[in-house]
């Protein structure tokens, strides 16, 4: 077969535009493609919801790829291991309650299984704003990451969603935008972002599940964004809480939307 360069380009452009137009409106929009966002996307899509994930970087997986200080191993607890088992990610016991997995296998498998479940991922897109109406958050305002990086003055486009998840990690970027736009109206003790505390894995992991919640109407936080918003410690390269947080936020949204 003789290959046609223009036909290759046309296939890419047409295929991408079909996806982008299809996801102008959806059930759930996820900001951030780390472990909690991917896990949430997997469970939401598997439940039959229309869900897309927007990641500003080229690669998906957040900080999971690098394990701890570039030693590409991660640790999970018993509950996190249950999720690894469900995804088919291998792990080895280290001590009672501690399980070690290969970070590259874990990250790539999370991404693959989430996509196969029906999650649509748009990488290289940054979330620069939200849509807020009387009923709460109704969508995201998007631009190419390259536009943001180059500092170009280019207006964004919008997508509509019935629920939004901030899974952007330590920076809790979507919640920051909401706080900046509306002031101290968040579902926190003083209505503002409480700020992430210093490393304490035991306390941070326990707090993470409690802090996975609806922080503003139709806006949920998961993963490290949860602890950053609610003032709990960071945890380092233990990822069980991140996986469980992703599953938990999916369960909350499924219960609300289904």
Swiss-Prot record:
Family annotation (InterPro entries): FAD/NAD-bd_sf (IPR036188), Thi4_fam (IPR002922), Thi4_prok (IPR022828)
Amino-acid positions noted as binding glycine in the UniProt annotation, renumbered to this chain: 234
Residues holding Fe cation: 155, 170
Reactions catalysed according to its record: hydrogen sulfide + glycine + NAD(+) = ADP-5-ethyl-4-methylthiazole-2-carboxylate + nicotinamide + 3 H2O + H(+)
Keywords: Iron, Metal-binding, NAD, Thiamine biosynthesis, Transferase
Enzyme Commission number(s) from the entry: 2.4.2.59
Binding site for NAD(+): 36, 55-56, 63, 127, 153-155, 224
Record's keyword annotation contains Zinc: no
Pfam family, one: Thi4
Protein's GO biological process: thiamine biosynthetic process; thiamine diphosphate biosynthetic process; thiazole biosynthetic process
Pathway terms, separated by semicolons: Cofactor biosynthesis; thiamine diphosphate biosynthesis
Signal peptide: none
One Gene Ontology term of the molecular function aspect: pentosyltransferase activity
Family per similarity comment: Belongs to the THI4 family.
Reported function: Involved in the biosynthesis of the thiazole moiety of thiamine. Catalyzes the conversion of NAD and glycine to adenosine diphosphate 5-(2-hydroxyethyl)-4-methylthiazole-2-carboxylate (ADT), an adenylated thiazole intermediate, using free sulfide as a source of sulfur.
Quaternary organization: Homooctamer; tetramer of dimers.
Protein's UniProt name: Thiamine thiazole synthase
Protein's organism: Methanothermobacter thermautotrophicus (strain ATCC 29096 / DSM 1053 / JCM 10044 / NBRC 100330 / Delta H) (Methanobacterium thermoautotrophicum)
Gene that encodes it: thi4
